[in-house]
UniProtKB/Swiss-Prot annotation:
The keyword Transmembrane does not apply. GO terms for cellular component: cytoplasm. HAMAP family: FabH (MF_01815). Pfam families: ACP_syn_III, ACP_syn_III_C. Keywords: Acyltransferase, Cytoplasm, Fatty acid biosynthesis, Fatty acid metabolism, Lipid biosynthesis, Lipid metabolism, Multifunctional enzyme, Transferase. It catalyses: malonyl-[ACP] + acetyl-CoA + H(+) = 3-oxobutanoyl-[ACP] + CO2 + CoA. It is an enzyme of class 2 (transferase). GO terms for biological process: fatty acid biosynthetic process. This is Beta-ketoacyl-[acyl-carrier-protein] synthase III. Gene3D superfamilies: 3.40.47.10. GO terms for molecular function: 3-oxoacyl-[acyl-carrier-protein] synthase activity; beta-ketoacyl-acyl-carrier-protein synthase III activity. It comes from the Bacteria.
Length: 326
């Protein structure tokens, strides 16, 4: 069964932190950040957690579509910064939304999370009466070492998502997908390490959980992104029976403007096909692709019938590609 995307929505913290703001807390400059990443500012949450942002997205999707909460079959949240280890962020959203009949779960695939969540959602849109909320949301700021300019300047908080409906018509959105995991390189990007520090059996007192800051081997991730991701996009498009020239928009993970520019060049496609909004939001991980999609739809840059490649890549290491006709 394929799906149709019937609505998009996003939610962002109100607090804007510019590159100049960061110079007050770390040794950096606007020029240093912008020249290396393309980022000018990002949203940093002051009070909202991941579930709060995702709930705003879910409610907006319902409001825009006119679909009743009782019609929602499933809620899938892609995040690497959940409120808790358990319950899932999706379960919190389900409860606060009042979607009592819906089942809910999280997917953790870092910056590929939204594309993996779309893949999972396909199994639950079996009839036109099936509606599924798929949301990517992150509050990465709570996991950052704000003294480390190599990582702290890159990220921002936010959430965005889509409302899917099952369809048997020729108006379906889904065309093809390609998911890749390279677990042998999983140590290149890690966050929230929870080691077994001591046996817990028989111990009195609260269990100790080790939380570590977000850490990334920048050079290795960049090489992975340029070495593997363009080839994966090319292969996914070919496997779908399409050519790169037929793709109207490449919505790739908003990690770095120089990286995206290089990808466009490697695929021999015009940069105009690779929209960017990272200058305003930074790297929002699982929220990155749906945030860009929602913005492009809202501004009428993406229209019904446009052929789009959604490509996430990052921790895992993972690559997730969904080819859709919006």
């Amino acid at each position: 069964m394929a799906f149709k995307i019937i609505e998009t929505a996003s939610a962002l913290p109100a607090n804007i932190v510019t590159n100049d703001d960061l110079t007050a807390i770390m040794e950096t400059s606007n020029e240093w950040i912008e020249s290396r990443t393309g980022i000018l500012e990002r949203r940093i949450s002051e009070t909202e957690n991941t579930s709060d942002l995702c709930l705003r997205v879910a409610q907006t999707l319902l409001d825009k579509s006119g679909i009743a909460v009782s019609q929602i079959k499933a809620i899938i949240v892609a995040t690497m910064t959940p409120d808790y280890y358990t319950p899932s962020t999706a379960a919190i959203v389900q409860g606060r939304l009042g979607a009592d009949q819906a089942f809910a779960f999280d997917i953790s695939a870092a910056c590929s999370g939204f594309t993996y969540a779309l893949s999972a959602a396909r199994g639950y849109v079996q009839t036109p009466d099936d509606y599924v909320l798929v949301i990517g949301g992150e509050v990465i700021s709570k996991m950052l070492d704000w003294s480390d300019r190599s990582t702290a300047v890159l990220f921002g908080d936010g959430a965005a998502g889509v409302l899917l409906q099952g369809t048997t018509s020729d108006q379906e959105s889904w065309v093809s997908e390609k998911l890749i995991t390279i677990g042998t390189e999983s140590d290149q990007l890690v966050s929230g390490y929870a080691p077994v520090k001591r046996p817990n059996f028989g111990q009195v007192g609260q269990t100790q959980v080790g939380i570590d800051f977000f850490k990334m081997t920048g050079k290795a991730i960049y090489q992975f992104s340029t070495r593997r991701v363009p080839k994966a996009i090319e292969a996914a498009v070919l496997e779908a029976g399409l050519t790169l020239d037929q793709i109207d928009h490449f919505l790739v993970h908003q990690a770095n403007s120089r990286l995206i520019t290089k990808m466009a060049s490697m695929l021999d496609q015009p940069l105009t096909k690779f929209p960017m909004n990272l200058q305003h939001y930074g790297n929002t991980s699982a929220a990155s692709i749906p945030l860009l999609l929602a913005e492009q739809v809202e501004t009428n840059q993406i229209k019904r019938g446009d052929l789009c490649v959604l490509c996430g890549f990052g921790g895992g290491l993972t690559i997730g590609i969904q080819i859709i006709r919006y």
